[in-house]
Regions:
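Glycine- and aromatic-enriched mobile tails/lids
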Residues: 1-134
Length: 134
């Protein structure tokens, strides 16, 4: 499979037009984050939110609380993102919050308990197996 993918990619790469006039990053108006602790603390908070509210056992109230806390984390991180020079830690945090949103949203759509994910509001397994596409 990997060989077929590489052959296909090699055939198509010359048909792609690449944009060469992309401007360099402009860091004007941004500064180094004065306190990396803001990023570190937000990461710890994200881990706690996901573990406490969106773990193996969950319910609709926990998922709603997780969503609200992710909203706050996103706002704080976005403000830092807009005013700071980019760092791998800041970008990772933004990406992890986005993944957290997707997990919470997918869990909110599922109105059943299946596999290792048990929702106390919906303890039974649905007859219909559904894939959640976000």
């Amino acid at each position: 499979f990997a060989h077929r993918c590489s052959v296909d990619a090699a055939e198509k790469v010359n048909k792609i037009s690449f944009q060469n006039n992309i401007p360099d990053w402009d860091a004007e108006g941004t500064s180094q984050p004065g306190e990396m602790i803001l990023i570190t603390q937000s990461l710890k908070e994200l881990q706690l939110v996901m573990s406490d509210y969106v773990g193996i056992v969950r319910n609709d109230i926990r998922l709603q609380r997780a969503s609200r806390r992710l909203d706050l984390l996103w706002e704080e991180t976005e403000q830092l993102y807009q005013t700071s020079t980019l760092s791998p830690q800041l970008l990772e945090l933004r990406n992890m919050i986005t993944v957290g949103y997707l997990i919470v949203k997918g869990a909110s759509f599922r109105k059943e308990s299946r596999g290792l994910h048990y929702n106390t509001d919906y303890p039974g397994k649905s007859e219909l197996v559904q894939n959640i596409v976000l």
